[in-house]
Each structure stands twice: as C-alpha cells, then as structure tokens.
Amino acid sequence: MTSPQTNSLDDIFGSSPPHEGEKFSQQASIEAPEPSDLPSLRRQHVTAGYRDGVSAAKGEHVQHGFDAGFPIGAQLGMRAGTVIGIIEGLLRGFESPTASRAVKKPLQRKEEGQGVETDEAEAARQAKREQLLRLYQKAVKELEVRSVFAGSEEESTRDNGGQEKPEVVLRRKGDAVISQWEEQVRVAHWEENMAALEPKEDEKRASTPTEQI
C-alpha cells in the first residue's frame, strides 16, 4: 500500500492528513491547563503546614528552654542585685544628714577650729557620696540584662560554631561581668560581716524563754 501523495499546497491550505509528529504536538496543546487557583491553594497549604510545625516545635522545646535557662538567670540576677544593693546602702548612708539623728545634743559654743573641721568633714562626705553615686549609676547600667548578656550569640558562633548550648554561653558571659563587680564591691567581705551579725540558731533558742505549762 502506497502512502498518499503529498501536495505542495497542503502546508498552506491544510488539506493533507496530519503526520505522526503533528498528532503528538496537537494532543499536547489540547490538554487542559492547570487551574489558576491551584498554585494559590498550594501556597496556603504550605503556609498552614509551616505554622503548625512551628507551633508543635514551640510546645516541645519552650518548656525545656525554660527549665534550662530560668535557674541561670535567677542565680545571676540575685548576684547582680546583691552588688547594686550594697552600693545603694552605702549611698544612702552618706546621704543621711547629721541633723536627722534621733537624739539631738544641746547646742554648744563652737571652739576655735571646730567649724573648720566640720566643714572639712562635710566636704569629704559629699565627695565620697559623689563617688558612690557615679559607681552606682555605672553598676546599674552595666548590670542591666541586655548589657550582661550582650554578644553571647556572636561569642558562641565564633568559639565553636554554635555547637555549645545557649544556657552555657549565657552563664559564662554573665558570670564574667558580675564577678568583676563582686570583686570591686567586695561582696564576699560584706557577706562575712552579715553572717557574723546574724545570731546563731542555738543562741536564739537559748535566749527564747520556754513556756511553762
């Protein structure tokens, strides 16, 4: 069986039967296009899945992060509060005027040179107060939370590529800052004095009168 004779004008008027390659191209072009709302629907599902994944991850890891980070923050906060409290107590002591004493002595005639010594003592007290005030303002600024933990993320990434636990980095960073202030204020010395002033438990029991039946 011979193939049908092709006419040179078939390409123009389209009277000749289509070839096999032409059938395939025509079928591909006739296929229905993808609905226009399908890409938008896909994006919505991806967004919803992403949000669900974030919520699930938060539920699993937030409690672990709280358990690991809260004790460290509480410990460092107590140490920083002790430093600021000591400086604040000293500052209040120097702010207390001499005239506010509970028992006032009767006025006496000033002897020669007594007024000069009083003025010098007052000037020294004011100078010490100004020094403590500057120290107090500096401590409040440097022991603020953002200042204590500043650069923790960069330090962790630089040292071990972010492999170290965040709470370990925060503890090391905070301890380095607060320890400097503890040495400057001599917190250990103040704690020893406070411990010596506190009555022992045995002394409390001995001084407390026993009830008689």
Curated annotation (Swiss-Prot):
Residues covered by region (Disordered): 1-44, 102-122, 150-170, 192-213
Keyword field: Cytoplasm, Nucleus
Gene Ontology CC: one annotated term: cytoplasm
Query: Which InterPro entries does the UniProt entry name for this protein?
Result: Essential_protein_Yae1_N, Yae1-like
Write out the ranges of the annotated region (deca-GX3 motif). Answer: 49-89
Q: Please indicate which superkingdom the organism of origin belongs to.
A: Eukaryota
Q: Where in the cell is it found?
A: Cytoplasm; Nucleus
**Residue ranges, compositional bias (Basic and acidic residues):** 155-170, 192-206
Q: Its Gene Ontology biological processes?
A: protein maturation
Q: How does it assemble?
A: May form a complex with LTO1.
Chain's role: The complex LTO1:YAE1 may function as a target specific adapter that probably recruits apo-RPLI1 to the cytosolic iron-sulfur protein assembly (CIA) complex machinery. May be required for biogenesis of the large ribosomal subunit and initiation of translation.
Homology family? Belongs to the YAE1 family.
What is the designated name of this protein? Protein yae1
Q: Which organism is it from?
A: Aspergillus fumigatus (strain ATCC MYA-4609 / CBS 101355 / FGSC A1100 / Af293)
Q: What is the taxonomic lineage of the source species? A: Eukaryota, Fungi, Dikarya, Ascomycota, Pezizomycotina
